[in-house]
A protein has these predicted regions:
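Terminal amphipathic alpha-helical/low-complexity segments used for targeting or macromolecular assembly
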Residues: 1-30, 35-36, 41-42, 78, ...
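Structural signal for interior beta-strand "rungs" in well-ordered beta-sheet cores
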Residues: 21, 25-212
């Protein structure tokens, strides 16, 4: 059972990086580790884990029993992957024909039981990307070509279809789902059992089937240190966008002066200009 060892770095280790340091590893004898797998320092591999293909796992990761990880996959440092997860498996896209697409996971993520994260497609980004400091609760599904930022929370049974983008500090409620190519902006909050068929702008709370806007995520912004003035400016922009019965172009024109004074509003303006599916209304 060959084990390769990787040099510790501050970023998720590249599959191509050579392993040159001497490491402290804890690997259960029932685990199956392929000869292309690269493990960092202090990695814990529990019973009946299967790791195959070009997989790189950074320092201080814990892989609980019965996890399956397939490559090409790069996993950063201090990630904790709980039992029965499937990480880096081939995507559920009928166009996929076995191309060597990838999954990249950052640092300090908690991935709870039965989560699934699939590699990308050549028709999409070619990779599925997960940032750092995220919590994926039980049964969360991250489909091919998704792009997930940092500091997000996905509650039980959250479902992301292919090509979805989730920006930083998003909270996703239990059983919520988002349509392929959808996007959720930074600091947004998606209610439990919500069905998203359109994009959710930054700071907005969304709920329902299909999801509608229900104000801004004021409590979340307060917890993250936004000033009262910035929160008021964000709410003013929200009112312009949703209460004045304007087109998106007209709303942007009225919100841009607010963003010039309060940079916290700029992500909303940028999001509105970039939205591909249109926003929830």
């Amino acid at each position: 059972m060959p084990i390769w060892c990787a040099l510790s770095t501050d970023k998720p280790q590249s599959i191509e990086e050579p392993f040159v340091n001497e490491l402290s590893l804890s690997i259960d004898p029932t685990a199956r580790i392929g000869d292309k797998v690269k493990l960092g320092n202090n990695v814990v591999i529990s019973a009946n884990v299967i790791i195959e293909g070009e997989v790189s796992i950074g320092d201080d990761c814990v892989i609980e029993p019965f996890v399956v990880i397939r490559g090409p996959t790069v996993i950063g440092k201090r990630n904790h992957i709980y039992q029965f997860c499937s990480i880096g498996e081939a995507c559920q896209d009928l166009k996929y024909a076995g191309e060597p697409t990838t999954l990249t996971i950052g640092d300090d993520n908690v991935i709870r039981e039965h989560c699934t994260m699939h590699r990308g497609t050549v028709q999409g980004r070619g990779t599925t990307t997960v940032g750092s400091h995220n919590l994926f609760m039980v049964n969360t599904h991250v489909a091919h070509d998704c792009l997930i930022g940092d500091h997000c929370i996905f509650s039980n049974n959250a479902t992301l279809a292919g090509h979805v983008t989730i920006d930083d500090h998003v909270v996703f409620g239990g059983l919520a789902a988002i349509h392929q190519y959808g996007r959720v902006g930074c600091h947004a909050m998606v209610g439990g059992m919500a069905a998203l068929n359109m994009d959710v702008p930054p700071y907005v709370m969304a709920a329902g089937h299909y999801a509608k806007p229900f104000g801004i995520n004021k409590v979340g912004l307060q917890r993250r240190g936004f000033s009262k003035e910035a929160i008021s400016a964000i709410f003013k922009a929200y009112v312009i966008l949703y209460k004045h019965h304007l087109t998106i172009e007209e709303a942007i024109e009225q919100i841009e002066p607010i963003a010039a004074e309060f940079p916290e509003v700029e992500p909303l303006v940028k999001f509105l200009k970039e939205s591909g599916r249109g926003i929830i209304r």
